[in-house]
Amino acid sequence: MDSGKIFEKLLHLAVGRGITVRFCPFQASEGRLRGNRLGIAQDLNIDKINYNLAHEIAHSFLHYDKGNMIESPKREEYEEQADRAANMILEIIKTAFR
């Protein structure tokens, strides 16, 4: 499946969860989820956009009740969990929608 189609599926998943996705001029990060708003850095290539979108969607499933994760002492653990889940989300999309 091409990267554009993967993006469409990820966007559909985000919107289905009530998340608004925007491209933003981030300098310190590639993606950020705050409540139901998800920002992706606007200068990324499509594969990085897809990965970061999947990563932030993963946070919405895994850590919706954890408050401010950036300042959490468990931040590294949460990031590793979201990384693993993002890879699973991408693999599911690639295999389920061939």
Predicted regions located by residue number:
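Active-site hotspot residues in diverse enzymes, especially metal/ion-binding acidic/histidine motifs
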Residues: 1-98
